[in-house]
């Protein structure tokens, strides 16, 4: 990790690692700094000195960190050429009992970090009132692969892909259970559709849509079965087709079909795989292949029940294949 620096106003210092856009920050009380005249951020004053490293917070970059009772006021901070505003509550605690984000806005261009070997997959926030937390994030127009779940005790988790395999950081050191991870996979699948259905998507929504689809697939690969793996590939294919990336759409569609042919999957999956292939070929401009795959999908859909057939036929009807 790269050296970050000191935060004189908070009496802390940090290390940083780039994650390809997001970054991971290791932060601690700076023993060489004067104690601040206020509570330190991230509830560090309440953390025992003997505590093991753990996930303590997350931040969202926004254009304007508007203060609220949950986030606290926005403080102006600076170090060297960098200046930023960040929400910090008077008690130093994070919003929503420690699982909601602080808000940060950089004055000028945000600093960039070299991309490290690890990649952030998703953030999972568990809270007794997920509706309130979800509404808070919606008001911020959240564009990130985040799963909000219900739970008696607030917990924060972050999933990473690393050269040494998957890693899950948590706020309580308990790891992730199968039920939580399956729910995350489903939440991220539905979050992807929310982005797909938006008529006002901008670039940051497109990036979040890709990240959410890939995160859903990543989690399903750990806790799902062949049908979930195939549909995860299918959704990734749809996302890239919508964004005009035919090559990546085709690669995911081919993996979807490969799973359908090699494993036991639900009856609708082969028809969905050929629908995805048809859409990818249409994006690539290969209309002959697109028609062939569309016809294969129609033939397979005939054997499905009415509900599944209607879904497949609706999807096939949205593929832009000219008459001929």
Walk through the language-model features, giving the residues of each.
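Amphipathic alpha-helical segments of tetratricopeptide repeats
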Residues: 193, 213-221, 254-262, 295-306
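Residue signature of alpha-solenoid helical repeat architecture, marking inter-repeat boundaries
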Residues: 179-187, 207, 227, 268
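Residue register of alpha-helical TPR repeats
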Residues: 186-187, 231, 272, 311
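Glyoxalase I/VOC metalloenzyme domain signal
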Residues: 1, 10-12, 18-180
